[in-house]
């Protein structure tokens, strides 16, 4: 049983579209069990990997997916303002690139651009993508701006390949959240 170490903390859990999205479900449970109020955000691509219903059932409020289905005219801004921390897990190359470039093309990236809260980015992608110069430059840009990066692990990837790029395990991400 986890201590209530995150009691009263508002954490926005952003899930982007990679196979590792399934790990966000367990991470959500760990955060809620520790007392956090978890507001989930999913990209349209993430919905190909896990269902909104699953994350909504485990989180503290329904999943946010689009800027256009909320009664609040600026839902991403309100969510970003009340966040104590934003966690992006998994963070795909697209989301990392958009965030580094300041492009807010969906609810997730708009929330990242609108927040002043600390942000923890947990990359997950195939080794070739992770090692690509543009991804590494975007990671370096985010680090320079004070974004916390939890490096991906080395291990078995989708398709059976082995290499760097696997999303950190939910317990490891949770431990990092506790430090922030």
What are these regions (language model features)?
Residues 1-120, 126-180:
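A cross-family phosphate/adenosyl-ligand binding-site feature
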């Amino acid at each position: 049983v986890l201590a209530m170490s995150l009691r009263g903390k508002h954490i926005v859990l952003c899930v982007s579209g990679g196979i590792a999205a399934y790990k966000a479900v367990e991470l959500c449970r760990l955060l809620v069990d520790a007392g956090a109020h978890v507001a989930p955000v999913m990209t349209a691509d993430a919905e190909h990997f896990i269902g909104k219903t699953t994350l909504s059932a485990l989180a503290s409020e329904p999943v946010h997916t689009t800027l256009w289905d909320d009664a609040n005219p600026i839902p991403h801004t309100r969510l970003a303002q009340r966040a104590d921390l934003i966690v992006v897990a998994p963070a795909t190359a697209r989301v990392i690139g958009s965030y580094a470039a300041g492009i807010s093309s969906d609810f997730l990236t708009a929330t990242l651009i609108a927040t002043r809260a600390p942000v923890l980015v947990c990359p997950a992608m195939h080794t070739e993508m992770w090692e690509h110069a543009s991804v590494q430059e975007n990671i370096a840009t985010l680090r320079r701006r004070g974004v916390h990066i939890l490096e991906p692990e080395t291990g078995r990837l989708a398709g059976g390949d082995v290499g760097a790029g696997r999303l950190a395990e939910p317990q490891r991400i949770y431990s990092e959240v506790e430090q922030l």
